[in-house]
Design a protein with these regions (language model features):
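Short linear, low-complexity motifs centered on an aromatic residue
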Residues: 135-147
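Amphipathic alpha-helical interface segments
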Residues: 1-116, 146-184
Length: 184
């Protein structure tokens, strides 16, 4: 798998038809994975709820409940990893489309969506080390795990989640790429 920091180095050339298939494949992968992410979020919320119940009742199972939160968070971040990897693959295909004759139209698209692409790829870089992300997230909550139920997670100095805004942006990017398919 490509490192996000040096992702464009030594990319082999690909014909445009294949690049559009790659975009389509990873777009579908990300979209179809969204319900899996929502389920993982719900499991995390339930684990946090159970942890809060342990705290309120001063139950001795607090450490066990915290471990269940950690496991649910790990699962969620693994699901995020798949989703943002799909963004990475779309970015790589878009970059290659920019290098084709008449590819300037794709360069403009890449520029238009660059902030969103880079935000997702920054998270992709972080979640390559899922355990470190989980530890950083647990540390960021400063012991108040109820913050995790807010669906906003800390990745290297930025808050991020996979939500309908992210999915909407992905839909816009996909449509924009496919609308320009006849350009190359």
């Amino acid at each position: 798998m490509r490192d996000t920091n040096s992702r464009y180095g030594n990319l082999p050339p690909r014909p445009p038809a294949l690049l559009f298939q790659i975009v389509q494949k990873f777009y579908r992968g990300a979209v179809s994975h969204y319900p899996v992410i929502e389920l993982a979020k719900e499991e995390l919320r339930q684990a946090v709820f159970d942890w809060e119940a342990c705290i309120e009742t001063k139950n001795n199972d607090e450490l066990e409940a915290e471990e269940l939160v950690r496991k649910a968070l790990t699962t969620l971040f693994l699901e995020f990893h798949f989703y943002v990897t799909c963004w990475l693959q779309i970015d790589l295909a878009l970059h290659r489309l920019c290098t084709h004759p008449n590819g300037s139209v794709f360069c403009r698209l890449k520029q238009r969506f660059s902030d969103d692409i880079e935000r997702h790829l920054a998270v992709r870089h972080c979640v390559d080390d899922t355990e470190a992300c989980v530890s950083a997230q647990m540390e960021h909550t400063e012991g108040d795990l109820s913050q995790l139920a807010n669906d906003s997670y800390w990745f290297d100095g930025r808050l991020f989640t996979v939500d309908t805004t992210s999915l909407h942006t992905l839909n816009e990017l996909y449509r924009a790429i496919m609308e320009k398919r006849g350009s190359v």
